[in-house]
Amino acid sequence: MAVKVGINGFGRIGRQVFKAIEEKYDGVLEVVAINDLFDAQTNAHLLKYDSNYGRFPGTVEVAEGNLVVNGETVKVFAEKDPAKIPWGDLGVDIVVESTGVFTDASKAKAHMDAGAKRVIISAPAKGEDLTIVMGVNDGDYDPAKHFIVSNASCTTNCLAPAAKVVNDNWGIVKGMMTTVHSYTNDQ
């Protein structure tokens, strides 16, 4: 039986998570709901047509205010308060928190209060149980004690794996890095 996923925030990250699940984890993960302040029609259009990554290869339709992707209904909600999203009623195992708003674990916990079993925050977080960078410290994850985890930042995910290889093989005494980042809505 597939792990049920809910996505809170259907912007760039939320849509890419959705596409990755559809294209690579079909039968293993299943997106059962999204929560975004845009309506289903707008979310369907943004999922289907992407000027950076191209068109979504499957079918995307709207029926009764929900998305229908490749024939499967995905519930659509437009709640500002995560505690009001019926994750528990939908049997959601994991919520991907990708709004950029609920990055403090005390706020992200509202998803669990609404019935989700775990939360993955797609940004740097405060008070999370663990920050995970795949290929660097993902072996530290313990499902018995890590319920709200952060996926770190895009910069960390780019730099840390390469730095780990260099450090493990030759050592790093000092380091400096810089990043150029597109404008975001919290700047």
Name these PLM-found stretches.
Residues 1-187:
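N-terminal Rossmann-like NAD(P) cofactor-binding subdomain of oxidoreductases
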